[in-house]
C-alpha cells in the first residue's frame, strides 16, 4: 500500500505572500527520493477554526501529515493548542524541553520571558522531538488514521528535524527504499530534455521508474526514482543513458553546483581565472567568490561598464570599440585577453551584452550577449540571444561564462 502523505503549512505570512513556503518544496523533494509523492499540500492562516478544520480533514484521509509553523512563543503561534483541541486533551508542560529552553537562553546571555514557556507545552500523550537546531521542539501525535508530525517553520529547524527524525522514520516504514538519481543539464530547454528522454522513459526495462524534470534556468534537472530489487544498478544504467543522450550538456549530479565545480577543477589543476564583466556588473565574480576556497583560483575581477574603462583598465583598443561597438565578439575577446593579462591568470573570461530593457537595436536586440574565454590555447567566443527580463539575461550570461570555462577544463 502506498503511503499517503500531506503537508499542512501554517501562518498568515504564507497566505499574504510575505514569506515563501520553501519548506514544503524541500520536503516534497526529499520524500520523492524515498519513492513517496506528497498527495496534497494545504496552506492555512493563524485562525483557530481554520486550523481545526484543516487538521481534521488532512488526518482523516492521510497516513502522515507534516505540519509546519505555529510553534513559537507568540499569541499567533497556535499549532500545539489546536492539535490538543482536536484531540480533546489538555496541553502539558514538558519539563525536559523547558530546561533545554532555559539553558539555551542562558547560553546566549538573554533573559527568558514567560511567554517562551509556551514552546515547552504539548498535547497530552505527544511524542516530543528535541530540537538541537533552535528553541521550539517538534512533536508527533496520532489523530484518527494519521500520524501528525509538527515542526517549527524556521527552515533550518524544519529541515534539520526532518532529516534527523522524520525521513529515517518514513524510510523504516517503507522498508525497501528506492534509488534516486539527479543529473543537471546546462541550457537545455525542459521540453527538449523531455523529448530526448522519451526512448529511455518508454523503455520496457524502465517500467515503474518515476521520471521528473525541473527547470531552474539556465539549468534543467532530470531526476528518476527506481523501485524494487536491483534499484541501484538500474538507476546507474539510466544515468549512463542520460549522459549518452546529452553529452557535454551534463555538468553535475544532485548537489553539485556549477560555480563550485569550476572552482574545484581550477584548484585541482593549480590554475587561476581573471574576469572582465560589462553587462553582468560583477555577477560572475559574485558566483565565483561565493564558493569557499575561491581565493585559491581568482585574483582579479573587473566591471568595466564604460568604454573608457575598457580601454584604460583592460587595454581594449579604442579603434576596436569604434569599429565593432562594445557589444561584439571582438570586444568580448579583447576583454577576456585583457583580464587574463592584467590578472596574470591561466584563464580570462570576458562578457559584454545588452541586458535591457532598453538599448537594443534591430542588429543587436536586447538579450544579445558575447562571452569569450582566453586561455593557453588561444581565445574562443560564443554569441547568444537570451530571452527574458534584465535579471534573467544577466544571470544566464554569467552562467554561460562559467560553462565555457567548465568545458575547457574537462
UniProtKB/Swiss-Prot annotation:
SMART domains: MoCF_biosynth. Transmembrane segments: none annotated. Pfam families: CinA, MoCF_biosynth. Gene3D superfamilies: 3.30.70.2860, CinA-like (3.90.950.20), MoaB/Mog-like domain (3.40.980.10). SUPFAM superfamilies: CinA-like (SSF142433), Molybdenum cofactor biosynthesis proteins (SSF53218). Belongs to the CinA family. HAMAP family: CinA_B (MF_00226_B). This is CinA-like protein. The lineage of its organism: Bacteria, Pseudomonadati, Myxococcota, Myxococcia, Myxococcales.
Amino acid at each position: 500500500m502506498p503511503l499517503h502523505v500531506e503537508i499542512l503549512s501554517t501562518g498568515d505570512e504564507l497566505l499574504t505572500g510575505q514569506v515563501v513556503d520553501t519548506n514544503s518544496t524541500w520536503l516534497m523533494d526529499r520524500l520523492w527520493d524515498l519513492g513517496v509523492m506528497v498527495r496534497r499540500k494545504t496552506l492555512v492562516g493563524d485562525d483557530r477554526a481554520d486550523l481545526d478544520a484543516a487538521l481534521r480533514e488532512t488526518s482523516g484521509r492521510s497516513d502522515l501529515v507534516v505540519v509546519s509553523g505555529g510553534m513559537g512563543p507568540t499569541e499567533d503561534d497556535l499549532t500545539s493548542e489546536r492539535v490538543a483541541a482536536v484531540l480533546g486533551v489538555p496541553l502539558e508542560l514538558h519539563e525536559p524541553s523547558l530546561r533545554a529552553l532555559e539553558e539555551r537562553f542562558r547560553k546566549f546571555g538573554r533573559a527568558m520571558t514567560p511567554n517562551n514557556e509556551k514552546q515547552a507545552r504539548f498535547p497530552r500523550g505527544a511524542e516530543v522531538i528535541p530540537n538541537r537546531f533552535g528553541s521550539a521542539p517538534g512533536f508527533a501525535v496520532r489523530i484518527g488514521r494519521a500520524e501528525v508530525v509538527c515542526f517549527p517553520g524556521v527552515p533550518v529547524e524544519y529541515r534539520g528535524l526532518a532529516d534527523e527524525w522524520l525521513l529515517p522514520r518514513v524510510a523504516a516504514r517503507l522498508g525497501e527504499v528506492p534509488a534516486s538519481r539527479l543529473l543537471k543539464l546546462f541550457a537545455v530547454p525542459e521540453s527538449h530534455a523531455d523529448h530526448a528522454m522519451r526512448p529511455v522513459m518508454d523503455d520496457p526495462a524502465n517500467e515503474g521508474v518515476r521520471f521528473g524534470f525541473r527547470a531552474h534556468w539556465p539549468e534543467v534537472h532530470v531526476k528518476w526514482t527506481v523501485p524494487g530489487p536491483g534499484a541501484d544498478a538500474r538507476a546507474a544504467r539510466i544515468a549512463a543513458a542520460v549522459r549518452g543522450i546529452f553529452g557535454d550538456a551534463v555538468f553535475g549530479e544532485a548537489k553539485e553546483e556549477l560555480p563550485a565545480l569550476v572552482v574545484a577543477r581550477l584548484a585541482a589543476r593549480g590554475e587561476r581565472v581573471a574576469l572582465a564583466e560589462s553587462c553582468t556588473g560583477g555577477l560572475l565574480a559574485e558566483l565565483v567568490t561565493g564558493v569557499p576556497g575561491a581565493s585559491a583560483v581568482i585574483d582579479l575581477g573587473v566591471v568595466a561598464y564604460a568604454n573608457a574603462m575598457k580601454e584604460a583598465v583592460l587595454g581594449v583598443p579604442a579603434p576596436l570599440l569604434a569599429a565593432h561597438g562594445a557589444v561584439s565578439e571582438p570586444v568580448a575577446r579583447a576583454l577576456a585577453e585583457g583580464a587574463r593579462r592584467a590578472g596574470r591568470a591561466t584563464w580570462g573570461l570576458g562578457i559584454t551584452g545588452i541586458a535591457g530593457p532598453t538599448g537594443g537595436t534591430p542588429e543587436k536586440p536586447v538579450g544579445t550577449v558575447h562571452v569569450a574565454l582566453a586561455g593557453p590555447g588561444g581565445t574562443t567566443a560564443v554569441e547568444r540571444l537570451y530571452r527574458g527580463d534584465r535579471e534573467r539575461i544577466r544571470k544566464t550570461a554569467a552562467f554561460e561564462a562559467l560553462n565555457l570555462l567548465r568545458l575547457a577544463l574537462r
